[in-house]
């Protein structure tokens, strides 16, 4: 068998023509130092700020410090298996999370991965977690109410859709309870709720999820959790992941409520990262950009203009104070960013006033324009009445000889405080709130014993439901106040049937 040189050269030429190069150019760096969730990497000269990188063991990281000779990378996962000398690959992607309807009812971590054991989340849509807030011309002023179902808030510190309302108070003053009740009250309100738990105990998050499930609220809620046992970068990223999931709905014309529980822990996680990255510390050892950390997050809550679809994100950030000190660094920062604050006081909480809202220090800067007409009418003087009662109460402790007007004010104040108390996980529809506040402000409760106020309220609602349902329907459908005569007839009719306890 003879081998022909022409055939061989033809074969070689054919092979050369069919050859496809599979050379892939990758930007690879080398770990020069690792520890405490931070890796220093040499060789990634073209990396972008905030870009995702992949370590040789599959763990992801995020580029934070771009220095002359190395890159400071925060590791988004376990870092114990990463060694000096390991390769680090660029991905060319900025941090993204999955978004869309498929997330509703699920519990995810800040990377958008499910942690509820219910299988993968079947969505291919993602959004970058850092995005620009809507501009001035893309916004509209807040004008629709967001009913929390809590009398003290809806009457005194009303919240509108698209507002940022800070909830501030010491630990164990019922901050989370206020948020949970607000989420429960959004049932049938066409709202999507996102609860972001930052640095909470896993048992606490489990309790919140069970409460939401029991009341059917998981049908419209996404839970994003970065528990206390997780690395600091995940605690820092959690709020951004939550608001990004909300933005997908907002830009599609829907209304979203995002609860950040709580931003003090996010600030502490960011401080930890910044100090490990050797950034210069400032006041209370926080880095210089801790204000920007929160402002760029909360500015993404907005009420969009009609041209942009009219969707909204309402933000309820929490900040924990130490011994009621609202003049500390993080509290003052977040107060200045938000459109008002609800201050929960431990003294009130322990004296049995729950929710423990301090009406004097709490304020809503834009919510008043979103309040429905009926509520505006009955709650107009409530804040002043409550403030003057608190003042008189302190004064009345010293003397027993009080004139009739002062005594009447004290009596009315005691009943006001009693009416504004509310049980846990029992949000109240706005029409019922208006009914009891009308009875209070028009003096119908003045001759009812303080101990009977709770029962009076419950029985009044039942009586109106059965005999004067039109009153409730008018408020729920139009937001307007029915005529005073109708109210007076209903409440006087009820009072004739109400039996005071002995």
UniProtKB/Swiss-Prot annotation:
Keywords recorded for this protein, A-Z: ATP synthesis, ATP-binding, Cell membrane, CF(1), Hydrogen ion transport, Ion transport, Membrane, Nucleotide-binding, Translocase, Transport
Biological role stated in the UniProt entry: Produces ATP from ADP in the presence of a proton gradient across the membrane. The alpha chain is a regulatory subunit.
Source species of the chain: Bacillus pumilus (strain SAFR-032)
One of the record's GO molecular function terms: ATP binding
Subunit (UniProt): F-type ATPases have 2 components, CF(1) - the catalytic core - and CF(0) - the membrane proton channel. CF(1) has five subunits: alpha(3), beta(3), gamma(1), delta(1), epsilon(1). CF(0) has three main subunits: a(1), b(2) and c(9-12). The alpha and beta chains form an alternating ring which encloses part of the gamma chain. CF(1) is attached to CF(0) by a central stalk formed by the gamma and epsilon chains, while a peripheral stalk is formed by the delta and b chains.
Residues the entry annotates as binding ATP: 169-176
Site (described: Required for activity): 362
Catalytic function, reaction form: ATP + H2O + 4 H(+)(in) = ADP + phosphate + 5 H(+)(out)
Subcellular location: Cell membrane
UniProt-recorded name of the protein: ATP synthase subunit alpha
Primary localization class, coarse: membrane
Keyword Chaperone: no
NCBIfam families noted in UniProt: atpA, PRK13343.1
Alphabetical list of InterPro entries matching this protein: ATP_synth_asu-like_sf, ATP_synth_asu_C, ATP_synth_asu_C_sf, ATP_synth_F1_a_nt-bd_dom, ATP_synth_F1_asu, ATPase_a/bsu_AS, ATPase_F1/V1/A1_a/bsu_N, ATPase_F1/V1/A1_a/bsu_N_sf
The family this protein is said to belong to: Belongs to the ATPase alpha/beta chains family.
Gene Ontology CC: one annotated term: plasma membrane
Topology versus the membrane: Peripheral membrane protein
């Amino acid at each position: 068998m003879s081998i022909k040189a022409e055939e061989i050269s033809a074969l070689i030429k054919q092979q050369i023509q069919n050859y496809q190069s599979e050379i892939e150019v990758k930007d690879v760096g080398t770990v020069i130092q690792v520890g405490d969730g931070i890796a220093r990497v040499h060789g990634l000269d073209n990396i972008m700020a905030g870009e995702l990188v992949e370590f040789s063991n599959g763990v992801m990281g995020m580029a934070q410090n771009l220095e002359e000779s190395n890159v400071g990378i925060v590791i988004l996962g376990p870092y114990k298996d990463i060694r000096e000398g390991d390769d680090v690959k660029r991905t060319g992607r900025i941090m993204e999370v999955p978004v869309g309807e498929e997330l509703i009812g699920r519990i995810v971590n800040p990377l958008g991965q499910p942690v509820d054991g219910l299988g993968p989340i079947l969505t291919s849509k993602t959004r970058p977690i850092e995005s620009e807030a809507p501009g001035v011309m893309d916004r509209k002023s807040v004008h629709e109410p967001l009913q929390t179902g809590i009398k003290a808030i809806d009457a005194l510190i009303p919240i509108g859709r698209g507002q940022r309302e800070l909830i501030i108070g010491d630990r164990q003053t019922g901050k989370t309870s206020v948020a949970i009740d607000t989420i429960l009250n959004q049932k049938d309100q066409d709202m999507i709720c996102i609860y972001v738990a930052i640095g909470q105990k896993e048992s606490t998050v489990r309790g919140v999820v069970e409460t939401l499930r029991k009341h059917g609220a998981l049908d419209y809620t996404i839970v994003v959790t970065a528990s206390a046992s997780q690395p600091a970068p995940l605690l820092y990223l959690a709020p951004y992941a939550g608001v990004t999931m909300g933005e997908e709905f907002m830009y599609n014309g829907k209304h979203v409520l995002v609860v950040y529980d709580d931003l003090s822990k996010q600030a502490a996680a960011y401080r930890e990262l910044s100090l490990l990255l050797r950034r210069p510390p400032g006041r209370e050892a926080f880095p210089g950009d801790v204000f920007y950390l929160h402002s760029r997050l909360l500015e993404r809550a907005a009420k969009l203009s009609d041209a942009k679809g009219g969707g909204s994100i309402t933000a309820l950030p929490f900040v924990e104070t130490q011994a009621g000190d609202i003049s500390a660094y993080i509290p003052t920062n977040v107060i200045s960013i938000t459109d008002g604050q609800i201050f929960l006081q431990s003294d009130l909480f322990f004296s049995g006033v729950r929710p423990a809202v301090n009406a004097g220090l709490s304020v809503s800067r834009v919510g008043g324009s979103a309040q429905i007409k009926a509520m505006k009418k009955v709650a107009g003087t409530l804040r002043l009445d409550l403030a003057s009662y608190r003042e008189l109460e302190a004064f009345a402790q010293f003397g027993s000889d009080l004139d009739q007007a002062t005594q009447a004010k004290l009596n009315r104040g005691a009943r006001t405080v009693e009416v504004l108390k509310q049980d846990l996980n029992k949000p109240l529809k706005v029409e019922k709130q208006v009914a009891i506040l009308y009875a209070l402000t028009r003096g119908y409760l003045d001759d009812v014993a303080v101990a009977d106020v709770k029962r009076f309220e419950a029985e009044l609602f039942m009586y109106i439901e059965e005999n004067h349902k039109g009153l409730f329907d008018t408020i729920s459908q139009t937001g307007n106040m029915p005529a005073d005569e109708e109210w007076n007839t209903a409440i006087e009719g009820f009072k004739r049937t109400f039996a005071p306890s002995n």
